[in-house]
């Protein structure tokens, strides 16, 4: 057992023995002063003779005091006991006005003002069976509302104090309320919780779990508003602005210095133009230019108009393969785009290989035209702008070669509805997927789609 515990137990026993001796002497004193001399002598022979310390204390108290100490404290206790609200309302014994005022003042005392009603020192036992268990003035279960144990523990936390119904009937403003902590101070009971630190942790919750807002202010800043907050742009829980939702229309360009969210790798840069929701951003940004689009065709818009990087194919449409349309050199309607698409190609010995055809972009007003593909490469189909049923350059005219320099060419037309056709008959014995029969079926499907667009 630790030495401190042993010392406390010894002090408790010594204090209890002293209290018993004093009580015995005060009883003998009370009997002497009230005229019960025979009873006092009998009490002395039976009790004080076995306890010399109590007899000595009784002799000293009788000589030094002309009044009974026990009687004085009993009168004080009984006055306060009778003035308690639950007893005075029931019409009990009379009490003084001072005792009534004492109870009213103790009820209205704010929490934390212990005064001399604080709990006794550690180690002193409470006489739970005695009416004046608490400090010799209050009945069992009665404790001033302001009397609190060290550390702010309410009286109900001690098993020796049963719950007081009067304290339960107290108004909310009279209860032991805890004021809110000042700014920057820790919350009560929040000690020991994880405290993540690092860049992007704006709020100092002092022990409470914090959320890392990307792009937030440095530590010490206020909480970030959520989307819809008036007077501010708002912040989403992941730190992105409302117009920067991933893969959604009108997606903005994220800042270059934005840290990754939850350890995820940064997303590749995308263009500021809108794209369908949920569509990947594998393509490079396209340069938009002013051009007239054919009716029903999905095109990239002019300046200020969001251009479509890709479109969702409609029912019955043919999947897109490696194809592109290239405008004339210096034409502002040309679109620079670089696609890497594997394409099947037949060599002279009949073996099938995969060749990646890289079509370099052509910008408006810069550089030379794209060189024609090799003779063995499959040519792409070009659709030239115009109106339905127009001359060469209309949506119904199809060229089997790249047509640079044509004034009526419209490279902004939708390539999804124009599958590529073979530039010529395949060599004998080849297993080309685009044979004559397949070309005929594809032509029928293409004509049906074009008729549906132009209808």
Swiss-Prot record:
GO terms for cellular component: cytoplasm; nucleus. Keywords: Cytoplasm, Neurogenesis, Nucleus. The keyword DNA-binding does not apply. Disruption phenotype: Defects in PLM neuron synaptic differentiation characterized by a misalignment of active zones and synaptic vesicles, branch point anterior to the vulva and overextension of synaptic branch. DD motoneurons display similar pre-synaptic defects. Increased expression of prk-2. In addition, mutants display a moderate uncoordinated movement, a small decrease in body size, a defect in egg laying and a slower growth. One of its GO terms (biological process) is positive regulation of transcription by RNA polymerase II. Ubiquitously expressed with higher expression in the head and tail ganglia, the vulva and PLM neurons. Residues 217-249, 281-302, 314-343, 357-442 are annotated as: Disordered. It is found in: Cytoplasm; Nucleus. Coiled coil: none annotated. Transmembrane segments: none annotated. Residues 19-51 form the LisH domain. Residues 396-406 have a biased composition (Polar residues). InterPro entries: LisH. Residues 288-298, 321-336, 407-421 have a biased composition (Low complexity). Involved cell autonomously in PLM neuron pre-synaptic differentiation by negatively regulating prk-2 expression and in neurite branch positioning. This is Single-stranded DNA-binding protein homolog sam-10. The lineage of its organism: Eukaryota, Metazoa, Ecdysozoa, Nematoda, Chromadorea.
